[in-house]
């Protein structure tokens, strides 16, 4: 019986070691993507605020609304959402109804949480396929008002393809798939008793980690 128990512990430890090898490069990729996403999102918010204030000034002060600010703000909002959704998902910042789950016994809570992550991964895989089709269709159409002002350097200006807007959805879903896989691995490692060997997710406090263990 002791030997059997030791084999079980050894097998569990080996599984944890394998999953840790897989999760480490994934954590590194998600860390880098998160930092870049946050920086670009701050830039997008700044541009969006400037564009909206410019439109307000022209529309209500000069009584001569510009044709492009509304679409430019929408462009920035789409990319802001696509870049920050993976960050929010990784840090547990997505809107969720947890009161029912928290009433479950701890083992059942972990099992249901893992099941929900697997379902989410399935939905995201379908979403990335639909998103890619949407991006491809976007190359056929151009924005009604957004242009690259190449006339500044003496070249012909051209309208931005809608695919660049739709790409925000595709990019966001791809990044969320990476985050989802990391969360599944973290859940499995924690369930097997290796939670203390996991590196803390940037942006999550130690108290939050203790509540998940």
Regions found by a protein language model. Give the residues of each.
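Alpha-helical transmembrane segments and membrane-interface helix-loop junctions
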Residues: 2-213
